[in-house]
């Protein structure tokens, strides 16, 4: 799907970003891996090269304008052009709003929203000049529904969705599409701590209609599709890749009874996630 294209992935050192880099290479793209962690980015580069494609490692802070510009210059200098960018860099800093330090708020917003803007703007200028390209942001269903206890995360991810739509609206007529992918629960190095408790892990799977959490590669598939020409008429949109979780509220509502039959339901709250089944009496 990406034969001959040159793609940048921010946050490409691990998780969804790494999976996107590897799949992009498998689909024929050369990949620039932009991340603050050079050592892990170099591991991703080796995985890209195993697919027979060229890899470029760019150590950078996505929230710095100078770094975003350098990212673009190095990519164009190495690959000749930029055909697409996936912005996936983020940092999750949990916290309740009444206690959240300003610096924690700023850290999340700087990486996950300001950083998306700076990198998309810098790469977008190259794509606008040639009249084609695709920009994909990795957001979250937490950007569509409030995720309490997660600090600035939901606000940041909601902003990423709107930024992707705005890019699509402003740049679509000039050949550059903007879209956003909203993953549900995915097991990555960033979220691994949430799955260490077996009860919480089981409870998280239980609230997904498919009965399991997602894999980074499944989110990468959506990213690659939106980068590709197969998505040529998809613009200013967002795609939920969550196993149906965001649309399953009624599945977790107690007291429903169909045809006189008792129904089981699972309860889940952020503070007490469980997969214990309770019978509707």
Whereabouts are the PLM-identified features?
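Short, small/polar-rich loop/turn modules that mediate ligand/substrate recognition or access, typified
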Residues: 86, 172, 177, 234-236
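Substrate-binding pocket helix/loop in short-chain dehydrogenase/reductase
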Residues: 96-97, 101-109, 204
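Canonical Rossmann dinucleotide-binding motif of NAD(H)/NADP(H)-dependent dehydrogenases/reductases
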Residues: 2-32, 167
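Residue(s) in the substrate-gating loop at a strand-loop-helix junction
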Residues: 140
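Active-site helix of classical SDR
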Residues: 120, 156, 164
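Alpha-helical segment proximal to the catalytic Tyr-Lys
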Residues: 125, 169-173, 232
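Short C-terminal tail/terminal secondary-structure segment
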Residues: 145, 224, 235-281
